[in-house]
Amino acid sequence: MANITAQMVKELREKTGAGMMDCKKALVETEGDMEKAIDYLREKGIAKAAKKSDRVASEGMTHVISNEKHAVVLEVNAETDFVAKNDNFQQLVDALAKQILAVRPDSLEDALKTEMPNGQSVQDYITEAITKIGENISLRRFEVKEKADNSAFGEYIHMNGRIGVLTLLEGTTDTTVAKDVAMHIAAINPKYISRDDVSSEEVAHEKEVLTQQALNEGKPANIVEKMVEGRLKKYLSEISLEDQPFVKNPDITVGEYVKQSGGKVVSFVRFEVGEGIEKKEDNFVEEVMSQVKK
């Protein structure tokens, strides 16, 4: 039998929103396999589909800037929210964004080696900022996009940089539409542009989970297939940007809204500070230990 720790229960609870004891049971039944435990809870109707990268933990900020041809979205991390709101830190983030936009490096490693306008490497520039600010700071990730003439960038920053979104639309130069789409993405967090982008493996996995879920609900086998078909269609529309009801006008989809301007979404990047990075453990572990040991 796998050793089920308090941290594992905590992680599963955060990913699924299920109760503590349900999470413990799911982990026991699946011998500690996190992904199988998520499926177990979903099949039992206890949890909804979990996003793989919904564990937001570290501090920092995202930033988005652009020029006529290129745009960059990046994330810079710090240790505390206090520093993330500091003017010096925000100036650092802006300087790094401008550097990456100007140089357009291929990788994070290349970016850290590039030379800032003052002659320092980006790495040395960050190291100097660490000394001044007094916290560990790191350039975590970035993406650079290029656009053609008949295209538009959409930039949106939410909650003072907690979430940063960059969209690229082709077939239109309407930056208002592009920004509206970026705002929608910040709020709804779609996984794909179109349902056609969803892999056959993911579709097959979801169909398997939904089938087991319907059978566990006691539905007759002869209607399970039709139920699964409807639920799968709903799932695909929920994770696909073009099919989602537009946040500013739910009567139309995002795809329909963009089409009104003659455009089409060709790419988007959504960074949320700390996605997938775990913080130090807090008192929650103590809270669940007594439950796990029962």
Swiss-Prot record:
GO terms for molecular function: translation elongation factor activity. Residues 80-83 are annotated as: Involved in Mg(2+) ion dislocation from EF-Tu. It is found in: Cytoplasm. Keywords: Cytoplasm, Elongation factor, Protein biosynthesis. GO terms for cellular component: cytoplasm. Pfam families: EF_TS (PF00889). It comes from the Bacteria. InterPro entries: EF-Ts_dimer_sf, Transl_elong_EFTs/EF1B, Transl_elong_EFTs/EF1B_dimer, Transl_elong_Ts_CS, UBA-like_sf. Associates with the EF-Tu.GDP complex and induces the exchange of GDP to GTP. It remains bound to the aminoacyl-tRNA.EF-Tu.GTP complex up to the GTP hydrolysis stage on the ribosome. HAMAP family: EF_Ts. Belongs to the EF-Ts family. NCBIfam families: tsf. This is Elongation factor Ts.
